[in-house]
Amino acid sequence: MEKTQTPSLTPDELSARSSTPFEEREEEEEVHYVGHLKFSFIFVGLCLSVFQVALSLQDIGWYGSAYLFTDCAFQLVFGRLYSMLPVKIVYLGALLLFEIGSIICATAPNSIALILGRTIAGIGAGGILSGALTILSQSVPRAKVAVFNGILGAVNGIAFICGPLLAGGIINGTTWRWIFYINPIISAPTFFITVFLLKLDPPKTNVKTWRGRIAMLDLPAFTLFLGSILCLILALLWGGKEYSWKNARIIVLFILFGVIMLAFMLVQKRKGDDALVPMRILCQRSIAFGMFFSFCTSGTGFILEYYLPIWLQVIKDLSVISSAVKLLPIIAAAVVFTTLCGILTPVIGHYVPFMIIATMLLSVGMGLLSTLEYTSPIRHVLGFQVPAGVGLGCALQQTLVAAQTILPMNDIPIGVSLIVLAQTLGGTIALSAADTIYTGTLSSSISSRFPQINRETVLTTGNREIRNLVPAESLSVIMDLCNKAIVKTWYLSIGLAAASIIGVLGMEWRRVTPPKK
């Protein structure tokens, strides 16, 4: 079998290499960077592609699960593709798949077609964010990558949080199909900019034949990874809803997830550098601890951004659009500090300080939100969002900067895909756990306090309609129960935010810029 040119470095050797002077590293890699004007257009295109993908994270049920399944599963495949094929071709392929999936959704005659469209769109999404970051790492010097990462992170955050607001406006003004029709419109400039302006050096590899490249994709291992992620997504989708968490189906799915994932890891270890994910990259200290940090902080962010609007809708009886407007403090804080961290990281020379700040402020912000009562004024909600938003802004891009700083150029796509995978899985698993806490607490407490209302009624009632289950004189009681159920989900996010300190402590302190002479 043909071998890649990437040397078989151990995780420790990778760490040692990252301390090599920046001038020497960039000379060794012989990178040819894009001109300023051309890069400006390319960067706008990258922002548009990231924006449309973040907008698509708002789906629920099978539609969202099909998307998340393929998004997670294909992260590693795209990481390997970017490391051995021209980045431009792979990135355009990911964009094309995402748009094909969106068009299928927009024209879907039934639910099956919609699920199929979301599945295809998820495959494309698996390569868009990691592709944008890979293009960045090859378009500007390493010392400047953090700045543009910060801007991309800000765009990603704006799109994710503003998704409900935009979707609500589209649905109120026209058909829901325009939620999907809008994606090809947003993507068109990116596609043409990439085709005509993007020119990058091909990855350094000895694999010249298509047979060798297909072998490097490690399809048997990918099948194992695909199966393990499918078991996990199904268990999270069905658990506590279709079946109880103690049901044999759910238990078997979790066991299968663990067994198949273990088999995948053993195959990766045996295949060395020919693996889909070489263990020397996965076990590299900053990558491993960075994945843990990203898992925890992403989980915290997903819970916050999902249940804070629910609190506003249920407790304060706000519409979807009004509740989205009340999220402006967290949007502003996250956007400003994501960008600011990107600017300051090269100035300070390290990314770890911002990770420390992120852990502290996320924990404080979620702690403050957990003190809310159903009688709390809106101004408390607005104020408590700020430290959490600052923490999210500081956390979003730092582990990606670490991967782009520490790894050799040809390994960056795989390292970035691992970090993005950890972020996606962290949000998926945390939201599922929070949903179990919320629905379980709310249904049991309401059924206990109001015996005439059974559990199934609570679970099938919309968030804003819960207040209609009881007479007006009992409204304060049910609002108190709803508040306590939502606050319990924030206890989980406090735990995740606090646990992220483990990831911080494990990170290497490596410079992102050359030391001043």
Curated annotation (Swiss-Prot):
Keywords: Cell membrane, Glycoprotein, Membrane, Transmembrane, Transmembrane helix, Transport
Gene disruption: observed consequences: Does not affect production of fellutamides.
Induction data: Expression is positively regulated by the secondary metabolism cross-pathway regulator scpR.
Presence of the UniProt keyword ATP-binding in the record: no
Listed transmembrane segments: 37-57, 59-79, 89-109, 112-132, 151-171, 178-198, 219-239, 247-267, 292-312, 328-348, 352-372, 381-401, 412-432, 485-505
One Gene Ontology molecular-function label: transmembrane transporter activity
Topology of the protein relative to the lipid bilayer: Multi-pass membrane protein
Stored InterPro entries: MFS, MFS_dom, MFS_trans_sf
Single Gene Ontology BP annotation: transmembrane transport
Compartment(s): Cell membrane
Predominant place of localization: membrane
Residues carrying covalently attached carbohydrate according to the record: 172
GO cellular component: plasma membrane
Positions of the UniProt region annotated as Disordered: 1-24
Keyword Transmembrane helix among record annotations: yes
Domain of life: Eukaryota
Similarity section: Belongs to the major facilitator superfamily.
Role this protein plays: MFS efflux transporter; part of the inp gene cluster that mediates the biosynthesis of fellutamide B, a mycotoxin that acts as a proteasome inhibitor. In the first step of fellutabmide B biosynthesis inpC activates 3-hydroxydodecanoic acid to generate 3-hydroxydodecanoyl-AMP that is then loaded onto the T0 domain of inpB. The 3-hydroxydodecanoyl-S-phosphopantetheinyl-T0 is sequentially extended with L-Asn and L-Gln by the two CAT modules of inpB. The linear lipodipeptide from inpB is then transferred onto inpA for the addition of the third amino acid, L-Leu.
Record-given protein name: MFS efflux transporter inpD
